[in-house]
Amino acid sequence: MSLDGKIGIVTGGTGGLGLEIARELARNGATVVITSRKQSKLQKACNLIGNNCYGFQLDVSKKKSLLNFAGSISKYFNNVDILINNAGFPFERKIWFKKVHNISEIELMNIIRVDLVGSFRITGEILKIMMKRRKGVIISISSTPAISGHNFGSPYSIAKAGLISLTKHIAIEYGQYNIRSFSVALGDIDTQAMRRSLSKKEILKAKNENTMKRLGRPEEIAKSIVSLAGENFSFLTGNTIIIDGGKVII
């Protein structure tokens, strides 16, 4: 698959799965734009990605930051071919393990503001660019709890379910512009963030919750996600692709 000449944006692209997606885009020939709330992380990540990488500071939860970013993209690039909505609210145990009746409105909205509203806003800005070129692919990183529910983490599940709905709306509203959209519902992925957040016992439990009895590897997940941006799936849109090692079927 070749993405030569394509420009791809990965929000939250300086670490974990986001960085691996950005690297996979670059390996396939794309020029990559990564974003992070922290300026200090951008250059280090671009060094890992390669020459065709540009870093922009962006806080998707802040409207002014989003508008400044969109203005910079319009100024420095003629088009955007691929948008990966990957930025997410950091995992917090004290919120994740709360039941619905114990979650405050502030805790709920902090997660929704980043995971859903931020992705919604940046998608709207990038759609304006894609519509002019009459082409583009938008991929939003969702999660299996958005489909199956979970014992914990209801704000996260709600936000990720919203991305699945957004994906369908993009497909219906913008298919006439040759703009395709996907959401990717991920299972448990072996990232540094996961290993920092969960105990060894919790990680073992996560492995046993899918049919393959292991965690997903960031590099294999990135390959699957990036393949959706190519021409092999040119008549596929509005779908949620489940990549979870068979978690939701057991």
Predicted feature locations:
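Catalytic Tyr-X3-Lys loop
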Residues: D81, H101-F120, K135, I139, ...
